[in-house]
Amino acid sequence: MKEKILITGATGNLGKLVLNNLLEELPASQLSILVRDVTKATEFKDKGVTVYNGDYNNYDSLISAFKNIDNIYFVSSSDISNRTKQHENVINAAKEAGIKHIVYTSFIRKNETETSPIAAVANAHLKTESWLKNSGMDYTILKHTIYADF
């Protein structure tokens, strides 16, 4: 049986690029997406991608979406003020649902001082990476730079 992959944030810039590239390599039946607004995902649903309505703030929606999924491409939250708790929800729900592997979109610079304008982002990534490392799940941490080409 082919492994199922779920991409979070698939209607955003990065998630959409990842999904479109995966659609070139894999059948849509292997792909699922988690989106907050399903009306923004009709183009992918029409291609045969399974669309789940969910939110990083809603733990139950994550559990529902992650059932029968093997791997998650986890796009970090854009909600800076809530992202630490949201990321914790994603990792805990993935573990509870039996996810085999998470690919997490982290950040390359994480040695910021507390007065740095990007300290909140860096600290959230550090915590998320720590949770992943201690989760017992297989993981890959991508160390992205700041996105400037969208």
Where does each model-flagged region fall?
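Glycine-/Pro-rich loop/turn segments that contact NAD(P) or position catalytic residues
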Residues: S76-F150
